[in-house]
Amino acid sequence: RIAVNLRHQFFAAQAAYPQMKAAGGGSIVNFGSISWMNGEGNFNAYTTSKAAVHGMTRGLARDWGVDRIRVNTVVPGWVMTERQIKLWLDADGERQIFENQSLKDKLYPPDIARMVLWLAADDSRMCTAQNFIVDAGWT
């Protein structure tokens, strides 16, 4: 799980750094998960690796801020991807969504994409080292 959930984000950021520095700055957006914030059980490697993404984000933001490189994490809730719907969404899952989320609607990929686009844009120029939670109020 560490290789799947953490390493690629570190190596991608590391590879992008020289070009972003040369360009005078940029934005790196990592992906976390609300699972570690909620203390989900039976997913220890997954939740540990997703918590590590937050630590990595804050460390890189501190190190690279001097080069005007912003580093943030988008933390999605239960997003209704085709895979999620096919493999895990059932009547109990629907009940959990509506019991736990403050906004009583399903979360879809475009909801996450809009946050990523905002973080990539200059509109978020003073945002770095942060977790941006897009979970309809679950956490």
Predicted regions and their residues:
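Active-site helix of classical SDR
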Residues: A13, S49, T57
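Alpha-helical segment proximal to the catalytic Tyr-Lys
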Residues: P18, R62-V66, R125
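Residue(s) in the substrate-gating loop at a strand-loop-helix junction
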Residues: S33
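A glycine/serine/threonine-rich, flexible loop-to-helix segment
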Residues: N42, V66, W78-Q101
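C-terminal substrate-recognition "lid" of short-chain dehydrogenase/reductases
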Residues: K106-V134, T139
